[in-house]
């Protein structure tokens, strides 16, 4: 029978509940347990797919094509498991399902209510995650903070589970903030006390409190929190800020968090094996080189919009003993001022990630052009690929006015065009080409050299694609098609033949990168950027 750990948050949002949940998952997995992690988001959207990155940050895409919260990226990277749509549930999905059942008459004339129908639906998704993943332990993070009206049905559902399956199968962990007041020079426990009081008023007694803090908690503070939160002193966990998120599992392990969980849930687990993780963290702390990557996007004021990209760069950097410094370049400002020399001064590589809409598109095209002309290692992702193709078609292949029909429907040369199967699609939500699809690699190319495989599976999120009507003309002028769908219908990767390293992909390689196992394309890109850095010194 599966065990369930519920992670709630209090005092403030953005405390790192997702990192805490992912770190606990890593520790339990290293004890030999099969772990899966869920995120419950209390917003009414079905998923974050149509939300602005400024509102939500990155949309993380799973293998099965779910558009999910960015925390799922953290979960996958920490526990090294592919998750699916059952691992991210929103209020919108829950109500949609319940209302659909009501219309079908599945409630047999009953009045449909939050309790039991909404709460039962929530619980069914938790049990389904356990079943689908054959999990020994399910960790479920409840989004938002305790006290938010939107979270109440989720909190009630997880409260009920203690009665449904027994106290020994359910554990509650509350993540809070212990703020430091500069004026008085002391840490304040009152916000955490009130947050736990609010949680207890809803019928949930936390078994452990993880305290985010800038300063170490004294024994006196821990004892005070234990007294007012009604938990053991050793269950008051200090979660200090760290330089790198991959240090968190070790920090929790030093306080026996995994041991406390194993004891509380009577887990039949093995001894903890954390040596490889410690080696990774030691490696991260002692990187001897540094490179700079210019990341050109229009959401750069909210860096969480590109969190998987920056993590993938870091993973590759670890592999080459290099810290990867990101120089954030606003594509809209670049388009307006045109100062490419200033923008890319000191960069060792240029990366243009995905995005939507025509705002700032000119700046991204300028970035691809600058990398092409100056032999700077370049990685284009999704829209980044489109921009590199547009630049090449216009500047090299002589197709003046070439563009994407997404932005210029009247372009005489739509080198990027809508996928045929998308032409009758009207709804925006969940209707793109989503999830993992196979890609056939062409031997003798940069892509094949990076992967060393004939067929790879990569995750997609797009409606527009390379237009094969211009394939022959572009390849005759030096564009290399290095990856295609198995039926040769879709172009997945393009390169430049007379360039040290210029690769652009239709898919999103960043979603499959892991610490200790960097994605092959990011690995090769960072390697070339490092060579570029060393040769310029």
From Swiss-Prot:
InterPro entries associated with the record: Class_I_gatase-like, CTP_synthase, CTP_synthase_N, GATASE, GATase1_CTP_Synthase, P-loop_NTPase
Origin species, per record, is: Natranaerobius thermophilus (strain ATCC BAA-1301 / DSM 18059 / JW/NM-WN-LF)
Describe the subunit structure. Homotetramer.
According to the lineage, what is the superkingdom?
Bacteria
Where on this chain does UTP bind?
A: 13, 188-193, 224
Keyword field = ATP-binding, Glutamine amidotransferase, Ligase, Magnesium, Metal-binding, Nucleotide-binding, Pyrimidine biosynthesis
* Additional detail: CTPSs have evolved a hybrid strategy for distinguishing between UTP and CTP. The overlapping regions of the product feedback inhibitory and substrate sites recognize a common feature in both compounds, the triphosphate moiety. To differentiate isosteric substrate and product pyrimidine rings, an additional pocket far from the expected kinase/ligase catalytic site, specifically recognizes the cytosine and ribose portions of the product inhibitor.
UniProt binding sites for Mg(2+):
71, 141
Concerning NCBIfam families, the annotation shows: PRK05380.1 (NF003792), PyrG (TIGR00337)
Signal peptide annotation: none
Gene, per the UniProt record:
pyrG
List the protein's name. CTP synthase
User: Mind listing the GO biological process terms from this record?
Assistant: 'de novo' CTP biosynthetic process; pyrimidine nucleobase biosynthetic process
């Amino acid at each position: 029978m599966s065990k369930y750990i519920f992670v709630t948050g209090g005092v403030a949002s953005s405390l790192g509940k997702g990192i805490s949940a992912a770190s606990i998952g890593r520790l339990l997995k290293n004890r030999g347990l099969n772990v899966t992690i869920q995120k419950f988001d209390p917003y009414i959207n079905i998923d974050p797919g149509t939300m602005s990155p400024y509102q939500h940050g990155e949309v993380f895409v799973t293998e099965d094509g779910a558009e999910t919260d960015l925390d799922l990226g953290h979960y996958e990277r920490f526990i090294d498991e592919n998750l699916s749509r059952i691992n991210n549930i929103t209020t919108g999905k829950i109500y949609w399902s319940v209302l659909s059942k009501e219309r079908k008459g599945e409630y047999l004339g009953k009045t449909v209510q939050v309790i039991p129908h909404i709460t039962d639906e929530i619980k069914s998704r938790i049990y389904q995650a356990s079943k689908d993943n054959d999990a020994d332990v399910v960790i479920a993070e409840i989004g938002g903070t305790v006290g938010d009206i939107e979270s109440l049905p989720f909190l009630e559902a997880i409260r009920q589970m203690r009665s449904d399956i027994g106290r020994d199968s359910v554990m509650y962990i509350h993540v809070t903030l212990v703020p430091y007041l500069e004026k008085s020079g002391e840490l304040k426990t009152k916000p955490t006390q009130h947050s736990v009081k609010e949680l207890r008023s809803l019928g949930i007694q936390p078994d452990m409190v993880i305290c985010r803090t800038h300063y170490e908690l004294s024994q006196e503070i821990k004892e005070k929190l234990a007294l007012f939160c009604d938990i053991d002193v050793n269950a008051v966990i200090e979660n200090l800020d760290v330089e790198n998120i991959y240090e968190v599992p070790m920090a929790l392990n030093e306080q026996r968090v995994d041991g406390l969980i194993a004891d509380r849930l009577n887990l039949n687990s093995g001894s903890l094996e954390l040596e490889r993780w410690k080696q990774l963290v030691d490696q991260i702390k002692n990187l001897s080189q540094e490179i700079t990557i210019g990341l050109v996007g229009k959401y750069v004021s909210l860096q969480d919009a590109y969190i998987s990209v920056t993590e993938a760069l870091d993973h590759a950097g670890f592999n080459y003993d290099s810290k990867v410094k990101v120089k954030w370049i606003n594509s809209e400002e670049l388009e307006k001022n045109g100062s490419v020399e200033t923008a890319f001064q000191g960069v060792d590589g240029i990366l243009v990630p995905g995005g939507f809409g025509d705002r700032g598109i000119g700046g991204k095209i300028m970035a691809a052009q600058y990398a092409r002309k100056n032999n700077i290692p370049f990685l284009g992702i999704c829209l980044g690929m489109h921009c590199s193709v547009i630049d090449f078609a216009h500047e090299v292949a002589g197709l003046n006015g070439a563009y994407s029909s997404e932005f210029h429907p009247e372009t005489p040369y739509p080198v990027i065009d809508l996928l045929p199967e998308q032409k009758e699609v009207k709804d925006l939500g969940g209707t793109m080409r989503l999830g993992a699809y196979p890609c056939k690699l062409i031997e003798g190319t940069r892509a094949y050299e990076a992967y060393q495989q004939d067929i790879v599976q990569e995750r997609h999120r797009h409606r527009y694609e390379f237009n094969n009507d211009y394939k022959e003309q572009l390849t005759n002028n030096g564009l290399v098609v290095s990856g295609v769908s198995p039926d040769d219908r879709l172009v997945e990767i393009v390169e430049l033949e007379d360039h040290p390293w210029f690769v652009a992909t239709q898919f999103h390689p960043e979603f499959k990168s892991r610490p200790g196992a960097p994605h092959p394309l990011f690995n090769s890109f960072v390697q070339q950027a490092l060579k570029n850095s060393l040769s310029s010194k």
